[in-house]
């Protein structure tokens, strides 16, 4: 493949992104990433090992570079081919196509620890025996406790302890000091 944009230039000095842009511009249609990568590799005359070492950077550059657009299913095109409005419409139509696909049935879950799922005799339902799970109505305890609290509010703060305990704690013997 000969690209007119790069006639007379050293292929070792060309970036893979520049070559990919020229290849897509020449072909005029979107290409799968694999085909685009192979075309870039063959144009730059890179060995498989050299190209494989730079392949991840090439893919990253395709994503980051604003002149390329991913069209889904790892197909790439030039952004200039698609007006902004058609990009939104293409994405919306792609979502509509997904809805037309048949819906996969969900598989029935199998419990590997039970020999027969229909035989529930040995299975214990732990959710139904917890009394804390049952809702209990809150009792009105304000009327019962109110007189007891009133008694405490009238309590005298000048309570005096018998001198026996306080006196023993505050007295120091001469023997205790040594």
Curated annotation (Swiss-Prot):
Residues 14-81 form the HTH HARE-type domain. Residues 120-143 have a biased composition (Acidic residues). It holds the Pfam family HARE-HTH. PROSITE patterns: HTH_HARE. Residues 120-178 are annotated as: Disordered. One of its GO terms (cellular component) is DNA-directed RNA polymerase complex. GO terms for biological process: DNA-templated transcription; regulation of DNA-templated transcription. GO terms for molecular function: DNA-directed RNA polymerase activity. Keywords: DNA-directed RNA polymerase, Nucleotidyltransferase, Transcription, Transferase. Belongs to the RpoE family. Participates in both the initiation and recycling phases of transcription. In the presence of the delta subunit, RNAP displays an increased specificity of transcription, a decreased affinity for nucleic acids, and an increased efficiency of RNA synthesis because of enhanced recycling. NCBIfam families: RNAP_delt_lowGC (TIGR04567). RNAP is composed of a core of 2 alpha, a beta and a beta' subunits. The core is associated with a delta subunit and one of several sigma factors. This is Probable DNA-directed RNA polymerase subunit delta. It comes from Pediococcus pentosaceus (strain ATCC 25745 / CCUG 21536 / LMG 10740 / 183-1w).
